[in-house]
From Swiss-Prot:
Organism encoding this protein: Mycoplasma mycoides subsp. mycoides SC (strain CCUG 32753 / NCTC 10114 / PG1)
Quaternary organization: Part of the 30S ribosomal subunit. Forms a tight heterodimer with protein bS6.
Cited Gene3D superfamilies: Ribosomal protein S18
PANTHER family tied to this protein: 30S RIBOSOMAL PROTEIN S18, SMALL RIBOSOMAL SUBUNIT PROTEIN BS18M
A GO term, aspect molecular function: small ribosomal subunit rRNA binding
Function: Binds as a heterodimer with protein bS6 to the central domain of the 16S rRNA, where it helps stabilize the platform of the 30S subunit.
Pfam families: Ribosomal_S18
Name assigned to this protein: Small ribosomal subunit protein bS18
Length: 75
């Protein structure tokens, strides 16, 4: 019996692919792509973002939450 090996596809960095240099906290539609259904920021291993982009993304989401553009908890 042969065991099939599962190949993991490398995740593509969304921000480098679309040539986005600055993640704006006012761009709510973009930020919603990186938030889970219950309102948590998705980790790098799921989104495929680079460490630098993940830090900028988290900062932008936190700013949007403070400005009441995004909710803290989604019910």
């Amino acid at each position: 019996m042969q065991v099939k090996k599962i190949k993991k596809r490398k995740k593509v960095n969304f921000f480098q692919k679309n040539n986005i240099k600055y993640i704006d906290y006012k761009d709510i539609e973009l930020l919603k792509k990186f938030i889970s259904p219950n309102g948590q920021i998705l980790p790098r291993r799921i989104t495929g973002t680079s460490p630098k982009d993940q830090r900028q993304l988290a900062l932008a989401i936190k700013r949007a939450r403070q400005m009441a553009l995004l909710p803290y908890v989604i019910e």
